[in-house]
Amino acid sequence: MQFAANGQNRVEVITMEMNYIRRGSGKPLLLIHGIGGSWRSWQTILDDLAIEREVIAVDLPGFGDTPPLSGKVSIRTLCDAVTRFLGENNLNGVDAVGSSMGARLVLELARRGGVLGSVVSLDPGGFWKGWQIPFFYHSVNLSIKLVRALQPVMPQITNSAIGRTLLFEQFSARPWKLSPKIALDEMRSFAESPSFDELLYNLAYGETQKGTPKDSIKKPLVIGWGRRDRVCFPSQSKLALEKFPDAKLHWFERCGHFPQWDKPQETVRLILDSTSKNVNKAVSASI
């Protein structure tokens, strides 16, 4: 086992290392961020979750402090990496929460079976169709180009309520209320992610998300959706439930694409309530 210089832990996954942080004690809970994010995407709820759970928040390959995969970057290959990570750390059956792309990832792992316990999927991507596909791709692609171009002045922009509103209007129902630190961390992570462009294209135009027959997922499965999501529109929840008929849908009112930003306390309660129903055998790794 290797330790990063900044005190965060790293675990070898195939021919690379996966960076992650751990906080709290209790039944393990895995957090998986969205495209362009990192473990810091969970800062608004991480400490509250850690009061009751041992939280393990990862940086997926090609994001945060984890090196990219050597081959194709897709939901499938990222799922393979997470599966290997869990197996090597005695975390099979761990409860998991995903956000955005990470929300689709935990749904795919639930579909595969035998990997996760209870699952909470927050505003998952992958359930768009028709005009929504190019809208997702081009709007996010334009956003990342702008974010990269503005990096020299990003601290000043994120320190302003007006700047945060302009930057995060598509992602948050109340972007001006985001803390400057969280906003800056997210914009830095977006700009510095080497796997962003390839994964974005594959999310939009790659493999479509497969579903499961009813009664095939035995563990609790909850899909949370913001009523004001402008990235993955609320109407997409219909297809998500068609493909995952065992899931229960939770609506976040007056909430955008990231419930952990707009509705942190409600998100914490949803996660704890949804995952407490399944006491699995996952144990924390001895690191």
Predicted feature residues:
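Acidic catalytic loop of the alpha/beta-hydrolase fold
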Residues: 227-232
